[in-house]
């Protein structure tokens, strides 16, 4: 099993969306996706394609790069919660918590409560 780490940049998101039918059918790859932009449309469409093709994706719910660098951990967690719950189905998308020095016990508890 291979777990490539994707930073959710536009080209990575589009590549994942277009490869979802092939990758889902082979079931040998489970990408970890950390969004880098607060705009959710492209990432949401990609996650919906992965869900439709049964491609397991590990979605970082509390991203920390680019658009999220200046957000408090609780704010990025809330952003991720909204993205995750906006998906019509979530059987193949798994919420994932990014561990790091800014992660507080309160954010960890909130993640456990939500997911």
PLM feature spans:
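A broadly used, surface-exposed interaction patch
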Residues: 51-114
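Conserved, mostly hydrophobic/aromatic
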Residues: 31
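Short, solvent-exposed loop/turn at the beta-strand->alpha-helix junction
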Residues: 39-41, 103-104
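Histidine-anchored nucleotide/phosphate-binding helix
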Residues: 14-21, 41-54
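N-terminal basic/disordered segments at the start of proteins
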Residues: 1-27, 37
């Amino acid at each position: 099993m291979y777990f490539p780490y994707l930073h959710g940049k536009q080209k990575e998101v589009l590549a994942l969306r277009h490869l979802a039918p092939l990758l889902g059918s082979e079931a040998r790859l489970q990408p970890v996706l950390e969004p880098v932009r607060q705009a959710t449309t492209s990432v949401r469409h990609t996650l919906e394609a992965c869900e439709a093709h049964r491609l397991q994706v590990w979605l970082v719910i509390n991203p920390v790069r680019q658009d999220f660098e200046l957000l408090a951990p609780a704010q990025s967690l809330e952003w991720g919660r909204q993205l995750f719950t906006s998906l019509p189905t979530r059987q193949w998308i798994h919420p994932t918590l990014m561990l790091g020095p800014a992660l507080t016990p309160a954010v960890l508890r909130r993640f456990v409560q939500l997911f």
